[in-house]
Amino acid sequence: MPEPRHTIRIGPAGWSYSDWEGVVYPPHGGKFDELGYLAQFFDTIEINSPFYRIPPPTHSRSWVRRVSSNRDFKFTTKIFRGFTHQTEKVTAGDVDAFRNYLDPLANADRLGAILLQFPWSFKNSPESIEKLRTLFEQFAAYPKALEVRHASFQNEEFFAFLDGCGVAWVNIDQPLFHDSVKPSDAATGPVGYIRLHGRNYEKWFSHAESWERYNYLYSREELEPWVERIGAIAQRKETYVVTNNHFRGQAIVNAADLELALGRPARVPPQLREVYGERVGSV
């Protein structure tokens, strides 16, 4: 594989999971800076908590401070679900509040992209395109990446639309069902973006707990095609790769797998070696 022309940042989606204590983090039972700890090992983390509630700017300022030891670190962040899943409830005040949350990240040059994630039920239509245009305009000042999960969007015409709007297409790995978005190496807009969700077919649409759909550990063989795609995208764009199979630190294992497969040094939290043994022994 040729040397990538652009930076590749690899990291997990989120950092605050109770099942990561004793697996990713050392047992601590009290105050412990999980974000600052992970920033020693990875150059990006996707912030997922804003999907559920818009954080105040005090939170984003704190997060910027906590990654200060890693000069190469950049966040990506999910957008509030009111803009993508519950649009009938969103207000102009929500737009302002989310911008206020973003500004400390952007002003510190720590914002790689906003992730606009839509569900599989969101399909390509004139109404959907107008909805996207409005959302893109509301957050025109920030780098954006769009994740859609319905195959009706996966075509050259839509890629050209995103490129014209300056928005990245998010390439995803997920369980493949009828009309699912397939694996790809498209690069539109300001950055390349890849999200690996796992392949837990049984729990993807039907699960008692939300973590169940992300309970999946990729084999290194399963990741090989993605290594090629990451390399291809990074020839064109600065690239973000996010592992979202977070249950029991599996996202960290696979992030390290990708680093190693790309010929880069893989830094692994020591606790992870104790839990996964030989699975991360050569990382």
What are these regions (language model features)?
Residues M1-V283:
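Residues lining hydrophobic/aromatic ligand-binding pockets adjacent to catalytic sites
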